[in-house]
Amino acid sequence: MDTDFWLQRWQDGQTGFHQDEVMPLLQKHWPALQLPAHARVLVPLCGKTLDLHWLAAQGHRVLGVEISPLAVTQFFDDAGLQPQRHTSRAGEHCIAGPIEIICGDAFTLDASVLGDCTAVYDRAALVALPAALRQRYLETVYARLPAGCRGLLITLDYPQAEKAGPPFSVDAAEVHALFGTQWKVQELEHRDILDQEPRFRADGVTALSTGVYRLQRD
């Protein structure tokens, strides 16, 4: 993962990927996971997403992971929260109520951190990684999640040659190839969103869809 790239994006305020509302697809499809309210939910590469607050409001314990200290600070400042802080090998832990964000590299997390995460919400992580890093991401993050872990994965699918990521295109075939050996994959929704994303159209992208997948580890 190109840490310097993401740190610079946050420093320069180039955060067009941040949404000022909770992701509607999260609200629509999260119930399909049928999780108990107290489940601990991993949100890798979380930025300062408002989705963390929504997940906490469902009764979950939320564990975000974010490389940018600025993003972590902005998340808590925007919510008027004063997190408690401590450090570990994983990074700096910032905790306020049911929400914890580790400011560190998701690729370095081990089972001691991830072992009790019974759910994962991946809207911005897999699509942020170039193809060469995605298998490693599965092997270093998803592989350390416990058996029975359930997840909601949201992807983008567009002709990669028409636009340089991130976010990158990850089509249904790649999702099944990446997860298929250790995870059950169920496609919940796949729809065209090009008209809703003028930045992609302005970049010359001719087709754009989003995919939503329910994951469950064997």
Swiss-Prot record:
Disulfide-linked positions: none
GO CC annotation: cytoplasm
PROSITE patterns: SAM_MT_TPMT
Keywords in alphabetical order: Cytoplasm, Methyltransferase, S-adenosyl-L-methionine, Transferase
Binding site residues for S-adenosyl-L-methionine: 10, 45, 66, 123
Superkingdom of origin organism: Bacteria
Subcellular location: Cytoplasm
Listed transmembrane segments: none
MF annotations from Gene Ontology: thiopurine S-methyltransferase activity
EC number in record: 2.1.1.67
Listed GO biological process terms: methylation; response to metal ion
A Pfam family reported for this protein in Swiss-Prot or TrEMBL: TPMT
Catalytic activity line of the entry: S-adenosyl-L-methionine + a thiopurine = S-adenosyl-L-homocysteine + a thiopurine S-methylether
InterPro entries xref list: SAM-dependent_MTases_sf (IPR029063), Thiopur_S-MeTfrase_Se/Te_detox (IPR022474), Thiopurine_S-MeTrfase (IPR025835), TPMT (IPR008854)
Family of the protein in this entry: Belongs to the class I-like SAM-binding methyltransferase superfamily. TPMT family.
Full protein name: Thiopurine S-methyltransferase
